[in-house]
Amino acid sequence: MDSKDDLDLKAQELINEARSRVTELDETAKLLLFKAARSFNGWKKNTVSDDQLREIYDLLKLCPTSANVCPIRIKFIRSKTAKELLQPILFEANRAKTMDAPVVAILGNDYAFFEHNSFLAPHKPQGIADRMRENPQLVAPWANLNGTLQAAYFIMAVRAVGLDAGPMQGLDKEAADRAFWEGTEVKTNFICSVGYGDETTVFKKLPRFEFDQVCEFL
């Protein structure tokens, strides 16, 4: 049996082991991730560790994308110098709350994502790369779809490690590209403040559609 088959079997064993330990999240976990989770505008002074930020990425990278591509790129803004570079790029209404966050993640989409195809999809090392080069009009849709999908996983991973997220679009993205992604094919998607949210800054939750308004059984 070759090494690929061994890896396949190990992957199957891991799934079976996980299912033997847990079949669904309990209500406490659902509260943390969904029901009581909010987008925060204010932050406590607690620090966020490097290990927490690494764990966030290590969780989101496991989630599915098209053909296992990985367009997401992340700049974790923490230092005074980096925040000073970010501040004028933010829309004025968002500056104070963003600068107050212990960490601000700039989430970008790498339009050269397909150059890593041989590593991420070794079973078809040139498949996606050839497709993108032959059909360049597909690059932006693929990068934006999968990068945004990974950015959504990012928010859930932030919550999963016990932190809070404050995602927002309110910045000059072209200026952010020049400031933080110069010399690359990365385009800014949005930013997300990360830290321990101050509950006193939260407003009432806005309405959501009910199941029957957006879903249908066929």
What residue ranges belong to the model's regions?
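Acidic, surface-exposed loops and disordered segments
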Residues: 1-218
